[in-house]
Design a protein with these regions (language model features):
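Active-site-proximal or metal-binding-adjacent scaffold patches in catalytic folds
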Residues: 1-84, 93-127
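Walker B catalytic acidic pair
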Residues: 89
Length: 127
């Protein structure tokens, strides 16, 4: 098992309100620990209220340029839930920007399952 700040934080059980600085901070921590620095930063990362979703990644073409945006809800039941879902969404960012994948829950997506387990993260389709 890997020692990590992520793993140590997964026992936090109080409600977590996300600020933009939190999103930036945890993206960097997860990128360094889980992705070993291989997840490119999306073009846009925002804390944004969204109905029926804790987080999502959107890709679009603007002026012939490929853009990827990551959106996360401003409230989570726990910090652990936020970390779990952000890490999940980061796989989609990685799929779009690193391997040119569709970003679906496919073989590339689930190739991260063992790595997630090392950090106490559960990789699944829905949360």
């Amino acid at each position: 098992m890997t020692n990590s700040y992520i793993k140590d934080t997964m026992d936090t059980f109080s409600e977590f309100e996300v600020e933009q600085d939190d999103l930036d901070y945890w993206f960097n921590v997860i990128n360094e620990e889980v992705f070993e620095g291989t997840c490119p930063s999306p073009h846009l990362m925002l804390v944004k209220r969204q109905r029926g979703s804790w987080g999502y990644v959107k890709q679009a073409e603007f002026g012939g340029e490929h853009w990827v945006a990551l959106f996360m809800s401003p409230k989570f039941p726990t910090l652990a839930a936020f970390i779990q879902i952000l890490a999940h969404e980061m796989i989609h960012v990685w799929q779009f920007l690193s391997v040119g994948d569709t970003g679906n829950h496919n073989k590339n997506f689930y190739s991260w399952r063992d790595r997630f387990k090392e950090f106490g993260l559960d990789l699944r389709r829905n949360y």
